[in-house]
Amino acid sequence: MSSKKAFLLPIVIEMNDDGYLASVPGLQGAFAEGDSVEEAVFNCVDVVKMIAAYRAERGESLGFDAVDFNQNTRMTVALPVGIID
């Protein structure tokens, strides 16, 4: 299996009138809404992937450090999980 790149990005999550807004500070256009915290984060990750692909086509960097991700890599991340009251 070949090595892949992973970006560790800060994602800010806020409540808004329609649900939740997730955004990546420092990455223009990287924001998305969702009805839940998880959906907003998932949608924002999709937007980041589109921005990364566009910038790669133009030979531009995403502006964040990439981590080589392979069979020997382990990464611990914190993900928000919405709790229903």
List each language-model region with its residue ranges.
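Short aromatic-glycine-(Arg/Gly/Cys) micro-motifs in beta-strand/loop hairpins
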Residues: 12-27
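A short, exposed loop/beta-hairpin motif centered on an aromatic-Gly-Thr core
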Residues: 28-39
